[in-house]
Amino acid sequence: MDLKLALVSAFPPGQQSLNEYGLHLACEMAAREDVSEVVVLADRLPAPRTELVLDPKIRVVRCWEFNSVVAGASILTALTREGVDAAVWNIQTATFGDRELPAALGLMAPATARLLGTPSGVIAHNILAGIDLENTQLKGQRLRQAVIRAAGAIVTRAMLAATYTTVTLRSYLDHLSAVFPNKEVHLVPHGTFDTAAQDIIPVENRPRRL
């Protein structure tokens, strides 16, 4: 079965966080024999730039803007238009914006996509619980920090409502498993797909070296 997959991610030559990870992920997805096309639903560039030359199986559709409250809706529209079999969301807390509302609305889109019929897997590179708000622009703002954490709990629950959720740090896995014991969360460390698995050569069959 040939699969048409979507990858929602910041993507080069853009400068947003996780763009290089998105590139490597798209290439690994396209390398699979059971994948016919990878449609990258990427962030729009602030100024025209030359797009990368990619594998013929990879097509980039720049359909959402950073800090836009309609970024999630734009992605959902693109998923429907493209008719993909499934979507992978390569995201972190500030993927869709560095302001609270656009960031939160964007992070709730994977669960919405699933409800609309597109199986959606989330690769979460960080979670709000792992961020020390005292080391951000919210330092000393106790009330606002409390509001952000409450909203963050709602957003995290929404992210866990995707078809599957993976995290890249053991501490995130431990936290989510403790707070949401009924949710299935997987650990996929950074760099897992960088090199293909290789058979280990038995010591006795290896060439002798000085």
List the predicted regions and their residue ranges.
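N-terminal subdomain of nucleotide-sugar transferases
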Residues: 1-46, 56-58, 82, 115-118, ...
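Alpha-helix capping/helix-boundary segments
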Residues: 46, 128, 171-173
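Conserved nucleotide-sugar phosphate-binding/catalytic loop shared by glycosyltransferases and other
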Residues: 48-74, 78-81
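Short N-terminal targeting/anchoring amphipathic segment
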Residues: 61-62, 76-104, 118-121
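Membrane-proximal helix-turn-helix segments that form the acceptor-binding/catalytic region
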Residues: 107-115, 143-164
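Acceptor-binding helix/loop patch of EC 2.4 sugar-transfer enzymes
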Residues: 120-148
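Helix-loop-beta element that forms the nucleotide-linked donor phosphate-binding surface
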Residues: 157-161, 173-192, 200
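Conserved donor-binding/catalytic core segment of Leloir-type glycosyltransferases
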Residues: 204-210
